């Protein structure tokens, strides 16, 4: 007579695997949350760089100071909005994020 061979995992083995997966998920999820926050900050910094580049390009083509409102309206950035400000204090608010302060645009090219 042949002996019956059972194969498969025991309940304890399955519980151990589920516990390990739970621990890994608890460690990994906060890291992904931090990545999305830093990505929003990077979008803000990129938008500020685009604003400064637009100011320089407008000055180079017009050879005169350009109002900050014109610089903002000439800058095309997706993923947030510029807040009306001055050459020294313009901010960009990424969608779902907090405002990022843009570096000062020199008053020689911005009015």
Language model features by range: what are they?
Residues 1-9, 95, 109-111:
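A contiguous, well-structured "functional interface" segment within a domain
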Residues 26, 34-37, 53-56, 60:
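Regular, well-ordered alpha-helical segments
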Residues 4-7, 38, 60, 74:
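Surface-exposed loop/turn and secondary-structure junction residues enriched for glycine/proline
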Residues 53-111:
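Periplasmic/extracellular, small/polar-rich flexible segments of pilin-like filament-forming proteins
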Residues 1-8, 19, 45, 51, ...:
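Short, contiguous, well-ordered secondary-structure segments
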Residues 33-49:
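Aliphatic-rich helix starts adjacent to a transmembrane/signal segment
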Residues 3-32:
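N-terminal single-pass transmembrane signal-anchor helix
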């Amino acid at each position: 007579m042949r002996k019956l061979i059972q194969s498969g995992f025991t309940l304890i083995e399955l519980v151990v695997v589920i516990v390990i997966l739970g621990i890994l998920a608890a460690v990994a999820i906060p890291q992904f949350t931090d990545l999305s926050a830093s990505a929003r900050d990077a979008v803000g910094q990129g938008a500020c760089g685009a604003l400064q580049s637009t100011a320089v390009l407008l000055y180079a083509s017009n050879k005169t100071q350009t109002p900050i409102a014109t610089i903002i309206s000439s800058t095309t950035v997706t993923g947030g909005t510029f807040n009306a400000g001055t050459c020294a204090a313009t901010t960009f608010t990424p969608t779902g994020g907090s405002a990022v302060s843009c570096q000062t645009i020199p008053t020689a090219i911005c009015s």
